[in-house]
């Protein structure tokens, strides 16, 4: 599901809100989550999961086009850990 598909679905379910209000709400939530992670903080949504940053160590990679070795710096990457309720819900 894309962001625009999410907005469309919410518009269909929440007919008392305008499409602009829903779009703004979704964008604000995502922006707030991104800035929270950017600040190094963890996000926990009970029953859904948590978002945090994991450090990826520096390593030697390869350029897929040329096969040459490339030094990759260490960096923080976003990580999502699903909560128990979500894991149980999607485990068909």
Swiss-Prot record:
Gene3D superfamilies: IHF-like DNA-binding proteins. GO terms for molecular function: DNA binding; structural constituent of chromatin. GO terms for cellular component: chromosome; cytosol. The keyword Transcription applies. GO terms for biological process: DNA recombination; regulation of DNA-templated transcription; regulation of translation. InterPro entries: Hist_DNA-bd, Histone-like_DNA-bd_CS, IHF-like_DNA-bd_dom_sf, IHF_beta. It holds the Pfam family Bac_DNA_binding. Keywords: DNA recombination, DNA-binding, Transcription, Transcription regulation, Translation regulation. Coiled coil: none annotated. PANTHER family: DNA-BINDING PROTEIN HU, INTEGRATION HOST FACTOR SUBUNIT BETA. This protein is one of the two subunits of integration host factor, a specific DNA-binding protein that functions in genetic recombination as well as in transcriptional and translational control. Heterodimer of an alpha and a beta chain. Belongs to the bacterial histone-like protein family. This is Integration host factor subunit beta. It comes from Vibrio cholerae serotype O1 (strain ATCC 39315 / El Tor Inaba N16961). The gene is ihfB.
């Amino acid at each position: 599901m894309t962001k625009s598909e999410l907005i469309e679905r919410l518009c269909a379910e929440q007919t008392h809100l305008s499409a602009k209000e829903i779009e703004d709400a979704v964008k604000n939530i995502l922006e707030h989550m991104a800035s929270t992670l950017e600040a190094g903080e963890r996000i926990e949504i009970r029953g859904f999961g948590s978002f945090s940053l994991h450090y990826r160590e520096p390593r030697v990679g390869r350029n897929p086009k040329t096969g040459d070795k490339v030094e990759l710096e260490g960096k923080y990457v976003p990580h999502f850990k699903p909560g128990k309720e979500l894991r149980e819900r999607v485990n068909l």
